[in-house]
Amino acid sequence: MGDEDWEAEINPHMSSYVPIFEKDRYSSGENGDNFNRTPTSSSEMDDGPSRRDHFMKSGFASGRNFGNRDAGESNKRDNTSTMGGFGVGKSFGNRGFSNSKFEDGDSSGFWRESSNDCEDNPTRNRGFSKRGGYRDGNNSEASGPSRRGGRSSFRGCRGGFGLGSPNNDLDPDECMQRTGGLFGSRRPALSGTGNGDTSQSRSGSGSERGGYKGLNEEVITGSGKNSWKSEAEGGESSDTQGPKVTYIPPPPPEDEDSIFAHYQTGISFDKYDTILVEVSGHDAPPAILTFEEANLCQTLNNNIAKAGYTKLTPVQKYSIPIILAGRDLMACAQTGSGKTAAFLLPILAHMMHDGITASCFKELQEPECIIVAPTRELVNQIYLEARKFSFGTCVRAVVIYGGTQLGHSIRQIVQGCNILCATPGRLMDIIGKEKIGLKQIKYLVLDEADRMLDMGFGPEMKKLISCPGMPSKEQRQTLMFSATFPEEIQRLAAEFLKSNYLFVAVGQVGGACRDVQQTVLQVGQFSKREKLVEILRNIGDERTMVFVETKKKADFIATFLCQEKISTTSIHGDREQREREQALGDFRCGKCPVLVATSVAARGLDIENVQHVINFDLPSTIDEYVHRIGRTGRCGNTGRAISFFDLESDNHLAQPLVKVLTDAQQDVPAWLEEIAFSTYIPGFSGSTRGNVFASVDTRKGKSSLNTAGFSSSQAPNPVDDESWD
């Protein structure tokens, strides 16, 4: 491939051999200390003849300590020979460059900080700095006891030489230290602060902490074995691995105008009345036509009016009475059709009528409703909707998601939690720490349920319903919503839903919204950038989302467009949560009218006035295509989707793409039809009419399409998948 071969995701490189270094039995001091005694006299800092005595006393000549980062990272560099870097009697990869002395008689092997650890102390601290060389640890950047040692590390492995976490507000459960700057292991570690307090020292991998920027790998030692754990394999799902997350998201605005801010429906909103809806299952309650027929309480009706809701969408007309009747539901409706309000309003109505159990006065919070979604951005969006509809009531909604400080999530919960909106990883962390009880759960909602049940999140969802205290499916109400429900996902859903659940299919089930004008262009891999710039220059400042397949390419294309003087930002799973929120904020406010995104932004995100979606790379599945173009043409507004079709890599999508275009009454290029009819896909019916993606109730046996080969149930392997949680 040429220099534009960006098709493959960058997989973590596996180390062929990771040595395990055991403590050298010869490195112990005379008195049985874990480390040798360090002279405390300041006169011994001289570079005169006494240095030879230092080597003799330290005993490190034959027992170098490879890859150990000691708990205290604040030594004053009183002994330059034992702590100075490389060479005889020095430790390789030692992150214990600290500003305190070993106390005589202490055999613990931990460093004790001295009281004179301050900015104006003239004693040098030569922690390795950033990309190499020595750095004065008494620099203002490392002043005070919270900055331990010099900043740095090798930009390759976690740890290395340098900075421990400057933040001491840790959970007790997380007090594990990564020892072994270059060849790491995990062991408990305490850092004495001089007053009996303990804190944690952790290695970092971000650019400021000297870690490798881009390849988030860490070596974890367990039962004498080393194993690589990467973020793509679930690194974000546990807060005890990797660098400590300190990000606390800013609270949303509390004024009423901001809470009820909404955008106007489009000219096509009235067309929703003509969309066909099919309900399958026994004894389905009749649909409602207005909000008044739902018999909601006055507070809810007031909030609905403030939010600008005047008419029910088709999915709301049928879903609200079904949920009010206490039935389990699987609802499939096109993107941007009001599915969030369809489950929030009846749940809130029940809670207002029956009363709530959780409050800020209870030690253990037991929410009545848990809403789970695959991405942080989507779950935060659901929370804002829940906060809007519950405004002025006793119901309190809380949102928790990965990439933020775990302590912040816990503090939000203990203030009272009736509706918990969460991503799977953070939810299981909170449950594992016993910060919430599940006995009062009445409603379990899976938004983007097809993604929640596939191989990406399916195991975690099964763990959730198997947790101690979680009511069985017969004792709770389970609701699933998505724009696509492949047949395989419906089979998996049987473990979560009662046998008499109802299935609501709205409009062209699993199909693209007809308010989106779809265009497919035949563009070769090496012509895509030029074509993209041409389209964006013609679009001007209209809000545009550009979808690519890999995280690396997202940053590359965003940088390329900025060089072309097109204001662009990017969002993907490798970006820090702070950066992801900043990117969305810049896109929403118009500062950057172009957002380059991977699948993180393809699901559920509701951004106002997105006029264009460009598929720079077509996705691997047709369901993902439907979700991507659904970012435009929402709530009756019109939009445009342009897709680049590469003959070398996208032929497998030709047949389903022709079907999607035909069902949405879009023009199908002749060249695409020719490819579609010349390409054989096992199980594909070839019909351009009828239901699509098997997103009809499989209990009826009506499916006319076997999606083998391109259904969303064949999700990417978790190793290659993006970190959504």
From Swiss-Prot:
Q: Where is the Helicase ATP-binding domain?
A: 320-503
Q: Name one GO molecular function term.
A: ATP hydrolysis activity
Q: Which GO terms describe its cellular component?
A: cytoplasm; perinuclear region of cytoplasm; pi-body; piP-body
EC number(s) for this protein? 3.6.4.13
**Compartment(s) of residence:** Cytoplasm; Cytoplasm, Perinuclear region
Q: Which UniProt keywords apply?
A: ATP-binding, Cytoplasm, Developmental protein, Differentiation, Helicase, Hydrolase, Meiosis, Nucleotide-binding, Phosphoprotein, Repeat, RNA-mediated gene silencing, Spermatogenesis
Keyword Cell membrane in the entry? The reply is no
Family note: Belongs to the DEAD box helicase family. DDX4/VASA subfamily.
Q: What is this protein called?
A: Probable ATP-dependent RNA helicase DDX4
Source organism (scientific name): Macaca fascicularis (Crab-eating macaque)
Question: Which lineage is the organism of this entry classified under, starting from the top rank?
Answer: Eukaryota, Metazoa, Chordata, Craniata, Vertebrata
